UniProtKB/Swiss-Prot annotation:
GO molecular function, one term: S-methyl-5-thioribose-1-phosphate isomerase activity
Keyword Isomerase: yes
Active site residues according to the UniProt entry: D240
Name of the protein this chain belongs to: Methylthioribose-1-phosphate isomerase
Enzyme Commission code(s) on record: 5.3.1.23
Superkingdom assignment: Bacteria
Family: Belongs to the EIF-2B alpha/beta/delta subunits family. MtnA subfamily.
Assembly and interaction partners: Homodimer.
Pathway where it operates: Amino-acid biosynthesis; L-methionine biosynthesis via salvage pathway; L-methionine from S-methyl-5-thio-alpha-D-ribose 1-phosphate: step 1/6
Organism annotation: Bacillus thuringiensis (strain Al Hakam)
Amino acid sequence: MSTVVTIPRSVSWKGDAIAVLKQTKLPHSTEYKTLTTIEEVWKSIVMLEVRGAPAIGIVAAFGLALASKKYTTLHIEEFQKKFNRDCNYLGTSRPTAVNLFWAIDRMRESIQEITTIKEAQKILEEEALRIQQEDEAVCRSIGEHALTCFKDGDNILTICNAGSIATARYGTALAPFYIGKEKGVRLHAYACETRPVLQGGRLTTWELKQAGIDVTLITDNTAAHAIQTKEINAIIVGADRIVANGDTANKIGTMNLAILAKYFDIPFYVAAPLSTFDITKQTGAEIVIEERDETEVTKIFGKQVAPVGTTVYNPAFDVTPNKLITGIITEKGIICGDYKREIASLFEKTS
């Protein structure tokens, strides 16, 4: 028996503007913001109004399509110059999320051979829509594959928000919860609150409750105790960048969970599309880790909680070594074991 599941969306194309779900306002209010310039798109990404690697790539693609419609030049060479400038500009918004650069490169390549501005504008809009549509199909496929790792009644721990609002639809790490709901397979999510921005507490709990999926919120430092006492069967997380050997960059605190999974002998899965892989980098040591503003740590909802002037280290991501990962779940299936060989083989088959 199948069930219709309500799944919120984060990015919508309006033809002359982009509507984005302001994730910074959740769960208190559901507000959509209209973006009409490339600068507004950049700021929306930086301010985490749009977040999640696939969603960032989608909004960047739409942002470039939008910007191209505003160029006043009549010459294709000048058009390309302005477009490349905007591509480079958007690339400075979130350096760790590889989907951002994947989407930018795909948009750039789509008009390499185009000779008229009107045709270029048309192709850019079509390509951005295609990126969004493909991501929805990819996320559903990830969910189908991930669901084979779990059984009815499983308790599954996750961190941050790798759900529908971080992608076109369904999400990556949360996709099996949605697909399971559709198919009558009950999965119970345990969501780490995810300091300092609380994506787990604000976003994962919100979207799963919207869909009627069981979710229990825990503080980040409860994870070990929860695994020990709540019969956690597995851990599943998303990814912002996976390199050639399987080392994975994801929200800060992810490696903590991988170490706990190893200690308690439960599976630790990474769920991500092929667009999140960066096979130009051989190990996680090559990944640039974004460091964010100290006020994310020293203030909570605008209120100072640490002495003024306190030194803060606030990396947005950490890198989980491949040896701690049970399997990487992609739209093409689940890879495990010799990640360097399996990832290379996967990309050979898709090239």
